[in-house]
Curated annotation (Swiss-Prot):
GO BP annotations listed: central nervous system neuron development; cerebral cortex development; establishment or maintenance of epithelial cell apical/basal polarity; establishment or maintenance of polarity of embryonic epithelium; gene expression; generation of neurons; morphogenesis of an epithelial sheet; myelin assembly
Protein's UniProt name: Protein PALS1
L27 domain segment(s): 120-177, 179-235
Membrane topology type: Peripheral membrane protein
Record lineage: Eukaryota, Metazoa, Chordata, Craniata, Vertebrata
The Guanylate kinase-like domain, residue ranges: 479-660
Chain residues that bind ATP: 486-493
Length: 675
């Protein structure tokens, strides 16, 4: 399946309302089609030879002659040394005794290779001091001029860098080769030895037979053969047809990539069509292509296993690769785009504030790689290289999701939501004489993320998309306040009161403030904080109250300091608040844990209220359900979790479990809380 490759870029022509926002209309014909295909790693490149100048060629020839002479001198010395040592050993060898085993006789034709001759590495300082010495030795003006020219060259930074590279290559080329297995069938050789030893009754032969039959030796031989078999496998020789086909593409730089394609390993790449070309469009995190680092966006695929790809549709390429396994040979034209090396990206964790289904998204560049999620899910974003389409994993699916999925980038999603709202507003009929009023009301109905420092500032509104999160484990002596929120008659007050009654030593309520006079049985600081109206209004202006209201001409409210006093005492503060108070509380330093108490179905809610002796009307039940939807839509981004109160006892146990989990497991909180 393929989808339009919009990639969120600005298009020249689009429908009204879309052009200004830089988004292509879903009805437009796509410029590109992007398809996810397998593309394993183990990649390699082959470059065309570099043309040398005549002067460089002469220098190279002189260096080659000097190297050849040094090799001949070294081999001559080595041969003389080997001959001398062999004569000495032959003179010291005693006559053979015991069993004549032809298998272990040293073949005369085998000469063990000695390590490469040592190469003395000159440093720039050595070269400079030698030239200085020569300069003092020579007296004629021409020689002095030549030496001065050489000294200037040696002091040049580019020459010094090239000299260091030369030394590094020389050291690498003269390193001894790693050990290479002589044979890959030691087990067969051991069986032959055991066959030879069968008729032997001497103690040494029987001891060798027992040793070769020991389980550890057998396991060692098996491991040796497995490793040797892999080491001795020759790399498949590139088919001559591949090199012949390169000539068909003129003077273009071509690279050949050989891939071992497994059936169960995702390769993580997408391709798109550009005219007749098939272009690698995207490298997906987690796939073999990304891990290899050798396959790049913008590479053009010319051939796969000798099959020409130019002119094929991405669907044909997908079908072709789905039937191919084993060794695949790709002929590619490298991308001409010059990109800076990618910086090491850090994973960011975000909480989604909207639902997303890629199957309903006409803008997703590759629907097969789209990652669906729901409001409240935690996403681990591992790549923002494409600002319009992030690559991410969903929390809990990392092990089952080998490849990262595509999710809308924050700015792209904000543009899209703004476009939708603009279109919806344009479609609404505007009544004559009420234009400004209508626009004002529409603006207030928008779902916005408020500025933390300006609670009522509509000019700083931001469409809800993602919120960066971090893990936080509450300290044992500083518990997070538990906030219960929900529509009336949904049980949040009953749950709060049950917790307070059953575990008084663990839970406490914040002492509210009031402006009314103290009654005889009330204790200041225990029942209420009694303050003057002037002081209360000053605290309201200073933003010290989480929520407040007026009843019978007296002000009542819960302050941030009252909640902090409960936290400092080591207890868990329990609050039941209105939805309008959540923003102020969340923007404080209290780190609240907000639990939404949702009602069950309408019929179940009627039964629960009937048990309490209440007989609500149908319209009252519908109002509760509608209020629930409204609270979830407007304030759901504040909720940490939700409990459906279909049974008060079960809801109480679930509430207690969630509170206990805060002591044992870290929770996701806004990153701004920890900065």
């Amino acid at each position: 399946m393929t989808t339009s490759y919009m990639n969120g870029h600005v298009t020249e022509e689009s429908d009204s309302g879309i052009k200004n926002l830089g988004l292509a209309s879903p009805e437009e014909h796509p410029k590109h089609r992007e398809m996810a295909v397998d593309c394993p790693g183990d990649l390699g490149t082959r470059l065309m030879p570099v043309r040398r100048s005549a002067q460089l060629e002469r220098i190279r020839q002189q260096q080659e002659d000097m190297r050849r002479r040094r090799e001949e001198e070294g081999k001559k010395q080595e041969l003389d040394l080997n001959s001398s040592m062999r004569l000495k050993k032959l003179a010291q060898i005693p006559p053979k005794t015991g069993i004549d085993n032809p298998i272990f006789d040293t073949e005369e034709g085998i000469v063990l290779e000695s390590p490469h001759y040592a190469v003395k590495i000159l440093e720039v300082e050595d070269l400079f001091s030698s030239l200085k010495h020569i300069q003092h030795t020579l007296v004629d003006s021409q020689s002095q001029e030549d030496i001065s020219l050489l000294l200037q060259l040696v002091q040049n930074r580019d020459f010094q860098n090239a000299f260091k590279i030369h030394n590094a290559v020389t050291v690498h080329m003269n390193k001894a080769s790693p050990p290479f297995p002589l044979i890959a069938n030691v087990q067969d050789l051991v069986q032959e030895v055991q066959t030879v030893l069968k008729p032997v009754h001497q103690k040494e032969g029987q001891e060798l037979t027992a040793l070769l039959n020991a389980p550890h030796i057998q396991a060692l031989l098996l491991a040796h053969d497995k490793v040797a078999e892999q080491e001795m496998q020759l790399e498949p020789i590139t088919d001559e047809r591949v090199y012949e086909s390169i000539g068909h593409y003129g003077g273009e730089t071509v690279k050949i990539v050989r891939i071992e394609k497994a059936r169960d390993i995702p390769l993580g790449a997408t391709v798109r069509n550009e005219m007749d070309s098939v272009i690698i469009s995207r490298i997906v995190k987690g796939g073999a292509a990304e891990k290899s680092g050798l396959l790049h966006e913008g590479d053009e695929v010319l051939e796969i296993n000798g099959i020409e790809i130019r002119g094929k549709d991405v669907n044909e390429v997908f079908d072709l690769l789905s039937d191919m396994h084993g060794t695949l040979t790709f002929v590619l034209i490298p991308s001409q785009q010059i990109k800076p090396p990618p910086a090491k990206e850090t994973v960011i964790h975000v909480k989604a504030h909207f639902d997303y289904d890629p199957s309903d998204d006409p803008y997703v560049p590759c629907r097969e790689l789209g990652l669906s999620f729901q409001k409240g899910d935690i996403l681990h974003v591992i790549s923002q290289e494409d600002p319009n389409w992030w690559q991410a994993y969903r929390e809990g699916d990392e092990d089952n999701q080998p490849l990262a999925g595509l999710v809308p980038g924050k700015s792209f999603q904000q543009q899209r939501e703004a476009m939708k709202q603009t279109i919806e507003e344009d479609k609404e009929p505007e009544k004559s004489g009420k234009l400004w009023c209508a626009k004002k009301n529409k603006k207030k109905r928008k779902k916005v993320l408020y500025n933390a420092n300006k609670n009522d500032d509509y000019d700083n509104e931001e469409i809800l998309t993602y919120e960066e999160m971090s893990l936080y484990h509450q300290p044992a002596n500083r518990k997070r306040p538990i906030i219960l929120i929900g529509p009336q008659n949904c049980g949040q007050n009953e749950l709060r009161q049950r917790l307070m009654n059953k575990e008084k030593d663990r839970f406490a309520s914040a002492v509210p403030h009031t402006t009314r006079n103290r009654r005889d049985h009330e204790v200041a600081g225990r029942d209420y904080h009694f303050v003057s109206r002037q002081a209360f209004e000053a605290d309201i202006a200073a933003g010290k109250f989480i929520e407040h209201g007026e009843f019978e001409k007296n002000l009542y409210g819960t302050s941030i300091d009252s909640v902090r006093q409960v936290i400092n005492s080591g207890k868990i503060c329990l609050l039941s608040l209105r939805a309008q108070s959540l923003k102020t509380l969340r923007n404080s330093d209290l780190k609240p844990y907000i639990i939404f108490i949702a009602p069950p179905s309408q019929e179940r809610l009627r039964a629960l209220l009937a048990k309490e002796g209440k007989n609500p009307k149908p319209e009252e039940l519908r109002e509760i359900i509608e209020k629930t939807r409204e609270m979830e839509q407007n304030n759901g981004h504040y909720f940490d979790t939700a409990i459906v109160n279909s049974d008060l006892d079960k809801a109480y146990q679930e509430l207690l479990r969630l509170i206990n989990k805060l002591d044992t497991e870290p929770q996701w909180v806004p990153s701004t809380w920890l900065r």
